Amino acid sequence: MANEMKKAAPFGMKDKVGYMFGDFGNDFTFLLSSSFLMKFYTDVMGVNAAIVGMVMMIARFVDAFTDVGMGQIVDHSKPTKDGKFRPWIKRMCGPVAIASFLIYQSGLAGMPYGFKVAWLFITYILWGSIFYTSINIPYGSMASAVSADPKDRAELSTWRTIGSTLANMVIGVATPMVAYVVVDGKTVMSGSRMTIIAGVFSICAILCYIVCFKLTRERVEVPASSQKVSASAIFKSIFTNRALLGIIVAAIFVLLSQLTVMSLAGYVYPNVYGSAAAQSTASLLGTVVMLIVCAPFASKLAAKFGKKELAVASSICSALVWLVCLIWRPASVWGFVACYILANIGMGFFNTIIWAMITDVIDDAEVRSGIREDGTIYSVYSFARKLGQAFSSGLVGTLLGIIGYTEATAFDPAVTRGIFNMACIAPIIGFVCIVLALVFLYPLNKKKVEENVAALAARRNSK
């Protein structure tokens, strides 16, 4: 295995593009779920929003076991000729895509209510807690094996975000244009079209995963860990590792903010403003801005000022934009789109560098303990992200229920006002909490990261 790694070509553009396609594949199913699953089950399947949110929240808590378990499996697995992490991408790309497609079966809309809730729960568990976990944790852990250079890892983080952004453009632009139809002057979702969309995106996900597997190479040998760590020990370590705790808290609120905005977009644009086309335009413009502004400059700004410092500044900017939107309450949909794009810039910088921050946390843990456990730490972080998903799903579903959202009241003025308020207040609170977590919990500023990199380099050179 070590000889094969030595023969691998130097880190380059193939690795960046390949890693980008990995997250492109992830987000063909993840973003579809984040943006349209709630809308599909409330408006097409006729399931109460609070129940949908509760089912999604319960499913995410199941990940407390599957994420950590998968991290342990990855850490204990032995490297093969394809590496330690890459083989999982090839093994699991089919199951995760099929499970995602099964979630969106509009042909079951006429089935009994209990059956539909059970179908959502089972398929959502299969997709998110089992198959998505089994491909996403090895994929994320793989970054530290592709290169040992922190600059290369920062570039991988940037390209990963580009992949996510491109997926967001495809899903965010194409889905509203195809999935929504006008019935009696109202913009509503077509169930049959959503089923077709889910099938197409599942095929696209498989193709992206294959490209990722083919183009990337692992160069840093990560031996199989012989240490057995219990789930309780792992979660205990969170509270003795400030860096891990800080990034976990920040990650929960990043997802809470981002996914709440994404989920509510399916209600803000068609219900508040009556324009599904504006949702497509907002996704397109948000993607363009992300690619032009955030992706090219995030790594450079992080290298100059520090990742933590950039994340704090960008989060403050996003919170301020949503506060302005809440006070302004634009009558035109394009005013809301403008606020969304400006807030997206701030969030985009953070999202671009957050994956590189995880490798900083892994390095910090190795400096302190002498043990490198990429898969375990990444799995705990992944679980934190899914907590953010769970809280977002539960929050959106609960709040929609509180304001009285149903198929019958979807366009009532009181309901649409509530939708708008939720779309602004949730990200304001989320970004403020991100800033507090990074300032008071996360210790890895620019100076500390550079010290850790130097310490690890000295250890490896002495062997």
Place the predicted regions along the sequence by residue.
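Membrane-embedded alpha-helical bundles of multi-pass transporters/translocases
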Residues: 2-463
